[in-house]
């Protein structure tokens, strides 16, 4: 029985990163964590392109454009949605998650969900590089692994 795994080597790989401007004080940290991790694992900074969109809801469209361009081995999607007093949070979170997942399934390109969906600003800050690590960094690792596992199949 074969065990198929993906290594964490990003040498020669190209990445697209879509980042939401809304809550950019959090998303900047997620983006920095992702880029740092990609480079530490062998990616060339010149092989990492970033696109900024207004908010998390808009991420899937640009992710799809990147995924279908043929330029990228993987696309990383970063954003932050913090619960407010209305149901807007639920719609944005659900549609962003559905859209990002659909892009991966439709294109066959790894598209990594790195949109924080938090109850409050403290939880978002914790996940952007403090107590709970940096989710942007974790998404970069996931992107590298997915590219390599797909190549191994």
Curated annotation (Swiss-Prot):
Stated role: Catalyzes the formation of 6,7-dimethyl-8-ribityllumazine by condensation of 5-amino-6-(D-ribitylamino)uracil with 3,4-dihydroxy-2-butanone 4-phosphate. This is the penultimate step in the biosynthesis of riboflavin.
Family from the record: Belongs to the DMRL synthase family.
Catalytic activity: (2S)-2-hydroxy-3-oxobutyl phosphate + 5-amino-6-(D-ribitylamino)uracil = 6,7-dimethyl-8-(1-D-ribityl)lumazine + phosphate + 2 H2O + H(+)
GO annotation terms (biological process): riboflavin biosynthetic process
InterPro entries: LS (IPR034964), LS/RS (IPR002180), LS/RS_sf (IPR036467)
EC code: 2.5.1.78
Keyword Cell membrane: no
Enzyme class: transferase
GO MF, any single term: 6,7-dimethyl-8-ribityllumazine synthase activity
Record's protein name: 6,7-dimethyl-8-ribityllumazine synthase
Entry keyword set: Riboflavin biosynthesis, Transferase
Keyword NADP: no
Subunit structure: Forms an icosahedral capsid composed of 60 subunits, arranged as a dodecamer of pentamers.
Binding residue positions for (2S)-2-hydroxy-3-oxobutyl phosphate: 85-86, 127
Residues that bind 5-amino-6-(D-ribitylamino)uracil: 22, 56-58, 80-82, 113
Active site: 88
One Gene Ontology cellular component: cytosol
Signal peptide range: none
Any Pfam family: DMRL_synthase
NCBIfam families the UniProt entry points to: lumazine-synth, PRK00061.1-4
Pathway: Cofactor biosynthesis; riboflavin biosynthesis; riboflavin from 2-hydroxy-3-oxobutyl phosphate and 5-amino-6-(D-ribitylamino)uracil: step 1/2
